[in-house]
């Protein structure tokens, strides 16, 4: 219905321009909003206020002129001017009720649009280092990315979901040496675990697997491991220097193949666990992209060479630098260190070169908020490589903070003291976790209230929405139990009987669903859908409590059941996009 109003206003503008009452070269975006108060109609526009300055006329005068030339339309009952020049539209009941017929006809397809026009979009998200289980902070990025992908698909985009596996960096070496040291401990060596090693129980479990499969072939005396190494942090040394030294010692003692054995076993075990965890969370990736593959297929060299060819690099103190400041970054960035090793930034350059090389029209990176420093450098690299910077969106997601018993739970992967995503799912369920994670804007801090997530009350939004769906299903079951009839055709022919305020409100709400999807997609804000579904559920509960739904008057009863089924379908469609189930009973 909003599209009808926008069309009528556009025609009114053309009429005024053709009559010479308005400049012909106006470039005005027509915005139509849902009326917040039913007394002000169904839709409202501030078009007259927007036109006031360029037309040099009072908003109210412009509103009167617009209303006078708006074409008549059978769906519009009346148009009123309010306040300083707002134009309010009141729709006929017949126009509102047409949406019910559309929903019942389209079913699961209702709300899907063509905003994206099949543009290819790559969304990269989660991409947590495969050095331990996913924690509750990662869960928010997972839920947000998956839901955004669903929203964009519903809006007509061709979406690919990708996880970037950081399998070639220093953190993986730290995990590998952590596993090896626990392996030595199982062999009876009196190891002292490094301050900067990974300490979780999963490290012991991987070490146990290595011990069971490999026996003692990789055992070396502890004295040979730590001989002549610098001091660790507890002894007054630097933990970063110490862990790098012990990695180098492990590589020397085990050899390339031996160290790779621990590296690959740890990587596979942790990555398989991450995949299983996300699968159980309803988050499914189309692609798992290996950082190591960038080295193996020459992408790192290609990305660096592309910057060289464009004159965006220089050498200083034996290192190769990217002229990032030429593109707005605060400082230039190292691509290749003086020792010949490429940096993480070089991998980022190559990865984004690869993304565009695969033909995506739009790239969306979803990072944790702690990666805010990466945003500018990634965008400068994309621009320097000759790609359209506006085709790259970087969305920062604040980590969720979990509270239990009023106390904040601290999380650190290396210390091993963290609450995993799996533990959260087991405690509150997938549905609550998926909804709570996307109920706020991604940049907003989130305090995850476990008690609220588990409560069966109207204060718990996901329970409230699911209960609305279950209530409708219950009404349909009662229909059969009471031997009453629902003639859908009769209901559709008598939708004009739906005149109660609760009914017109519900009809207006379900009519908004396609607009919510398009808006959420355009702004990359899935929380709009979460808010909307709660509003729709509230409308349904109010209706359920105020009206006798299974009334004796057959025509009215059938019309109301058509409305109920439409609401149920919209709830079902919206919950599916959020990754939340729609139970038929609760």
Curated annotation (Swiss-Prot):
Top-level EC class: ligase
GO molecular function: arginine-tRNA ligase activity; ATP binding
Pfam families given in the database record: Arg_tRNA_synt_N, DALR_1, tRNA-synt_1d
SMART domains reported for this sequence: Arg_tRNA_synt_N, DALR_1
Main localization, broad class: cytoplasm
This protein's record includes keyword Hydrolase: no
Compartment(s) of residence: Cytoplasm
Keywords of the record: Aminoacyl-tRNA synthetase, ATP-binding, Cytoplasm, Ligase, Nucleotide-binding, Protein biosynthesis
Sequence motif 'HIGH' region, location on chain: 128-138
Entry GO CC: cytoplasm
InterPro entries in the record: aa-tRNA-synth_I_CS, Arg-tRNA-ligase, Arg-tRNA-synth_N, Arg-tRNA-synth_N_sf, ArgRS_core, DALR_anticod-bd, Rossmann-like_a/b/a_fold, tRNAsynth_Ia_anticodon-bd
Keyword field contains Lipid metabolism: no
Subunit structure: Monomer.
Name of the protein this chain belongs to: Arginine--tRNA ligase
Organism annotation: Legionella pneumophila (strain Corby)
